[in-house]
Curated annotation (Swiss-Prot):
Lineage: Eukaryota, Metazoa, Chordata, Craniata, Vertebrata
Family assignment from sequence similarity: Belongs to the FAM110 family.
Pfam families per UniProt: FAM110_C, FAM110_N
Positions of transmembrane segments: none
Region described as Disordered: 1-84, 118-149, 186-242
Biased composition (Polar residues): 1-13
Entry protein name: Protein FAM110D
C-alpha cells in the first residue's frame, strides 16, 4: 500500500491555501531566486491516521485524512483572566501609589516642621500688641466687630508687593520718588488726622469745590472742637455730599496717569 506524502496534494482532496500560493508564486514574485526557493513551515504538524478506524460505525471512506493545520502554540489554551484578577491588580496598583504619596507627604511635612522648629528659637519673643484703638472697639457679639477683628491683624503685617503696588497706584519707584513718596501715604489723604491733609486738590481733577470746601471745614474751629465736628462740617458744605474714598482714589489715579503720560515722549500718530 502506497502512502502519499502529506506535503503533496492527493487527487481526492482540494489543495490547501499554502499549496495554491506555492503554485501561483510566479504571478506575484518577480525575483527568480525567491521563486525557486521553498519556505519550510515553522512548525510541522504530525501526520494524521492514514487508515480508517476499524470500529468506525459511520463507515468512513478509505482515503487518508488530511493533516491538520500546523499550530504555532501549545495545544493547551491559556485561561483568560477574569474580572476578579483585573480588580485585584487595580487594587494593588492603587495601594502602592497611595503608599508612595503618603511617603512623599510625610517627607514634606517633616521638612516644614523641621524648618519651623529651627526658626522658632531664633525668632524673638512676641511682644504684646498695644490696645486696639477706639475705632476697632465693639461688642464681641456683633458680626461687625467679628469682621473687624478678622481684618485688624493684617494691619500690623508688613506691606506686600501687591499692597505696595496699589498704594503707589501701579507707578514705578523712580516716578514715585520724583513725585514724592509722602504724597502716597495714607496719612496724607485721611481726613481724621488733622487740618493739614488734603490742602490742595490733585492737578488732574476737574472739580475743586469739594476739595476747597473740605479744607475750609478741616480748618474751621467747629471741627477742632470735638463732639459736634462732623455735624458742623456737614452744615458748612451747604448740603453737598462728601467725596467718597472710591471717587477720591479715582481722581488720584487719573492725576497720576496724566503725570505719567506727560513724562512719556509724545507718540506719532499712525493714521
Amino acid at each position: 500500500m502506497l502512502l502519499s506524502s502529506p506535503t503533496t496534494p492527493s487527487r481526492g482532496r482540494t489543495p490547501s491555501a499554502v499549496e495554491r500560493l506555492e503554485a501561483d508564486k510566479a504571478k506575484y514574485v518577480k525575483t527568480h531566486q525567491v521563486i525557486v526557493r521553498r519556505q519550510e513551515p515553522a512548525l510541522r504538524g504530525g501526520p494524521g491516521p492514514l487508515t480508517p478506524h476499524p470500529c468506525n460505525e459511520l463507515g468512513a471512506s478509505a482515503s487518508p485524512r488530511t493533516p491538520g493545520p500546523a499550530r504555532r502554540g501549545s495545544g493547551r489554551r491559556q485561561p483568560r483572566p477574569d474580572s476578579l484578577i483585573f480588580y485585584r491588580q487595580k487594587r494593588d496598583c492603587k495601594a502602592s501609589v497611595n503608599k508612595e504619596n503618603a511617603k512623599g507627604q510625610g517627607l514634606v511635612r517633616r521638612l516644614f516642621l523641621g524648618a519651623t522648629r529651627d526658626a522658632a528659637p531664633s525668632s524673638p519673643a512676641p511682644t504684646e500688641r498695644p490696645g486696639a484703638p477706639a475705632g476697632w472697639a465693639g461688642s464681641p457679639d456683633t458680626p461687625e466687630a467679628t469682621g473687624k477683628r478678622a481684618v485688624c491683624p493684617t494691619c500690623s503685617l508688613p506691606l506686600s508687593e501687591k499692597e505696595r503696588f496699589f498704594n503707589y497706584c501701579g507707578l514705578e519707584r523712580a516716578l514715585v520718588e520724583v513725585l514724592g513718596a509722602e504724597r502716597f501715604s495714607p496719612q496724607s489723604w485721611g481726613a481724621e488726622h488733622g487740618p493739614q491733609v488734603a490742602t490742595s486738590p490733585p492737578p488732574g481733577s476737574g472739580d475743586t469745590s469739594d476739595w476747597t470746601s473740605s479744607d475750609r471745614d478741616a480748618g474751621s474751629p467747629d471741627c477742632a472742637g470735638g463732639g459736634g465736628g462732623s455735624e458742623a462740617a456737614g452744615s458748612a458744605r451747604d448740603g453737598r455730599p462728601t467725596v467718597s474714598v472710591v471717587e477720591r482714589n479715582a481722581r488720584v489715579i487719573q492725576w497720576l496717569y496724566g503725570c505719567q503720560r506727560a513724562r512719556a515722549p509724545p507718540r506719532e500718530s499712525e493714521v
